[in-house]
Amino acid sequence: MTIDVAAMTRCLKTLSDQTRLIMMRLFLEQEYCVCQLVDMFEMSQPAISQHLRKLKNAGFVNEDRRGQWRYYSINGSCPEFDTLQLILHQIDQEDELLNHIKQKKTQACCQ
């Protein structure tokens, strides 16, 4: 599937932030609760929420509310999904920063 220049620009702009790019790579594998992302990225909850809001506004992620908790996963039905996959699969699985963040994955505090 192809996308127009404006859509590609929005896609690349959203992914241009290192934190959002890594989040999206993680979402290819599974969903995450906000509390897990806070621990993994060692960022404040408002900062994580701001990144997630940008990803959600772009249509790249789904938000699933379960009680007071919010879980995020990749939106496989977004028009840019094929492009997202192509970009995200280019990230080296042995990337030092990606693996550092993955190693901090914890059991969700919300479970």
UniProtKB/Swiss-Prot annotation:
Localisation per UniProt entry: Cytoplasm
UniProt-recorded name of the protein: HTH-type transcriptional repressor AseR
Source organism phylogeny: Bacteria, Bacillati, Bacillota, Bacilli, Bacillales
Alphabetical list of InterPro entries matching this protein: ArsR-like_HTH, HTH_ArsR_DNA-bd_dom, HTH_MetalResp_TranReg, WH-like_DNA-bd_sf, WH_DNA-bd_sf
Major place of residence: cytoplasm
One of the GO BP terms on file: regulation of DNA-templated transcription
Note: Can also bind zinc in vitro, but it does not impair DNA binding.
SMART domains xref list: HTH_ARSR
Residues annotated for arsenite binding in this entry: 33, 35, 39
A GO cellular component annotation in the UniProt record: cytoplasm
Known outcome of mutating residue 33 to S: Binds DNA, but loss of arsenite-mediated regulation
Chain's role: Metal-responsive transcriptional regulator that represses transcription of the aseR-ydfA operon by binding specifically to its promoter. Binding of arsenite or antimonite causes the repressor to dissociate from the DNA.
One Gene Ontology term of the molecular function aspect: metal ion binding
Residue span(s) of domain HTH arsR-type: 1-105
Keywords recorded for this protein, A-Z: Cytoplasm, DNA-binding, Metal-binding, Metal-thiolate cluster, Repressor, Transcription, Transcription regulation
DNA-binding feature ranges: 34-57
